[in-house]
Amino acid sequence: MIDRQRMGLWALAILTLPMYLTVTEGSKSSWGLENEALIVRCPQRGRSTYPVEWYYSDTNESIPTQKRNRIFVSRDRLKFLPARVEDSGIYACVIRSPNLNKTGYLNVTIHKKPPSCNIPDYLMYSTVRGSDKNFKITCPTIDLYNWTAPVQWFKNCKALQEPRFRAHRSYLFIDNVTHDDEGDYTCQFTHAENGTNYIVTATRSFTVEEKGFSMFPVITNPPYNHTMEVEIGKPASIACSACFGKGSHFLADVLWQINKTVVGNFGEARIQEEEGRNESSSNDMDCLTSVLRITGVTEKDLSLEYDCLALNLHGMIRHTIRLRRKQPIDHRSIYYIVAGCSLLLMFINVLVIVLKVFWIEVALFWRDIVTPYKTRNDGKLYDAYIIYPRVFRGSAAGTHSVEYFVHHTLPDVLENKCGYKLCIYGRDLLPGQDAATVVESSIQNSRRQVFVLAPHMMHSKEFAYEQEIALHSALIQNNSKVILIEMEPLGEASRLQVGDLQDSLQHLVKIQGTIKWREDHVADKQSLSSKFWKHVRYQMPVPERASKTASVAAPLSGKACLDLKHF
């Protein structure tokens, strides 16, 4: 009797247990941004139509349903209008049915808005990947809200304005998708509740995936009918690489054969084949590589054929290579090449040094060889106009040496020996002409302006006028070049003071320097091989090599310079 009563009690308990059983399962995480609307759904909702109750998990306090509260329950949804950072926590939802209670937990985290455009990963929804030419992105969680169009879209925090971006309902359509369209896309919409509008934003990444394709195998290595050099007794490695398209490939493989026999059946332990490994080529093609390794090359290996095979569902391709003995390096030839290059480099360095030291001599020699009879059609009458300080009453003794240098030394060398035409003030006289006009015309018709600089030159008014005209022609009009000859006296006290010269003349002295004439330094004052005359000839134009008679007579002709005694 007692056993029957116990059995009845157990049966009653088993029958009534489902009425009071509560199933605790299901948990989910959700997040939102501060001062935005956040609506979450009970994880245990499913298709149930039974009422849902929400609780604060830490206090078991029931969350009200009145809409006047900032946090309230609406059917199976929990609304935060707006959400705040202190709302973060775990919330429990209970679905009560006549036979079973289901409890779910929701971990809600409210974050502050990022100060910059860089959105952290924990605020990103699932990444969207697309490969179609035209693609659409869905705004996440928008179906939970009471929103009205339009939805605003942003890419990397910048509003989308191009016509190929089209917003329709909760979607963003992108036409002609390219890799430039990859990035973070944010949708922004408005949730309306009790006459108040709340902003909601959601961000997800978009990446472009190109569609894969399969093609006939293409062997990229080794080349067709290639011959590889190896050393006897040394190890050797040969790679067989082939590309099959993009994406996953079914039944694609690369392998080696030796004399039309697979490596595993060839029977040589020295020769092993590594399994194919996946690689990507420079154009993003999917490729496979298999490496044939020979631990020690023998003479027998040189007579074998090695086939690189690539095959897939499209077909098979084969590249055959052979091995040959590597020729030893001819060290003697290398020594000869290194020695020859070293000698050539030394010769070039010596040549550069010689040219730098003897550049003027080389240039003068080149003139004599290459242009011995050069003619000019520039319309100039003279090769040089000589500008020098005149003799006047009370002049220093050095003035007379300048006069002798200008009227005797210069013509003897430059006119009689070199064939130049000089225009020298005071050498010839054509009366009845205006002095200033004739000086200016003579300077304009000269290819060089030779300044003879002396310590007493500042006392010569004629020198100052000619200097002005000549510098204007050389520096302003770029009509001629200037040669500066400095007369060095024997005493140190009467040297030329450059600071006393005109600014333009000081500039020329600083830039190109002067050619110094000192009588005690020159043994043969008219020798063309002296350093002074080499420098003068180098700066003079290339002379016309007319007959010596013509060269001497030229200064005495009607085109010679004028005697401007009363300048």
Curated annotation (Swiss-Prot):
Stored Pfam families: ig (PF00047), TIR (PF01582)
Region of interest (Flexible linker), residue spans: 204-216
Q: Which residues are glycosylated?
A: 60, 101, 107, 146, 176, 194, 225, 259, 278
Q: What is its EC number?
A: 3.2.2.6
Q: Organism classification, top ranks?
A: Eukaryota, Metazoa, Chordata, Craniata, Vertebrata
Its record classes its membrane topology as: Single-pass type I membrane protein
* Protein name as catalogued: Interleukin-1 receptor-like 1
InterPro entries documented for this protein: Ig-like_dom (IPR007110), Ig-like_dom_sf (IPR036179), Ig-like_fold (IPR013783), Ig_sub (IPR003599), Ig_sub2 (IPR003598), IL-1_rcpt_fam (IPR015621), IL-1_rcpt_I/II-typ (IPR004074), Immunoglobulin_dom (IPR013151)
Q: What post-translational changes are documented for it? A: Phosphorylated by GSK3B at Ser-442; leading to proteasomal degradation.
Main function:
Receptor for interleukin-33 (IL-33) which plays crucial roles in innate and adaptive immunity, contributing to tissue homeostasis and responses to environmental stresses together with coreceptor IL1RAP. Its stimulation recruits MYD88, IRAK1, IRAK4, and TRAF6, followed by phosphorylation of MAPK3/ERK1 and/or MAPK1/ERK2, MAPK14, and MAPK8. Possibly involved in helper T-cell function.
Q: In which tissues is it expressed?
A: Predominantly expressed in hematopoietic tissues, and in macrophage, erythroid, epithelial and fibroblast cell lines. Isoform A is expressed in brain astrocytes and microglia. Isoform B is expressed in brain endothelial cells.
Q: How does it assemble?
A: Interacts with MYD88, IRAK1, IRAK4, and TRAF6. Bound to its ligand IL33, interacts with IL1RAP to form the minimal interleukin-33 signaling complex with a 1:1:1 stoichiometry. Interacts with KIT (bound to KITLG/SCF). A mast cell-specific KITLG/SCF-induced interleukin-33 signaling complex contains IL1RL1, IL1RAP, KIT and MYD88. Interacts with TMED1.
Superkingdom, natural source:
Eukaryota
Q: Which residues lie on this side of the membrane: Cytoplasmic?
A: 356-567
Q: Which GO terms describe its cellular component?
A: cytosol; external side of plasma membrane; extracellular matrix; extracellular region; focal adhesion; membrane
An example GO biological process term is: macrophage differentiation
- Residue intervals of the TIR domain: 380-540
PROSITE patterns on file: IG_LIKE (PS50835), TIR (PS50104)
Q: Report the leader peptide range.
A: 1-26
Catalytic residues, chain numbering: 466
Domain (Ig-like C2-type) spans 27-109, 120-203, 217-324
- Bilayer-crossing residues are 333-355
Q: Which residues carry this modification: Phosphoserine?
A: 442
Which ranges sit in the Extracellular compartment? Answer: 27-332
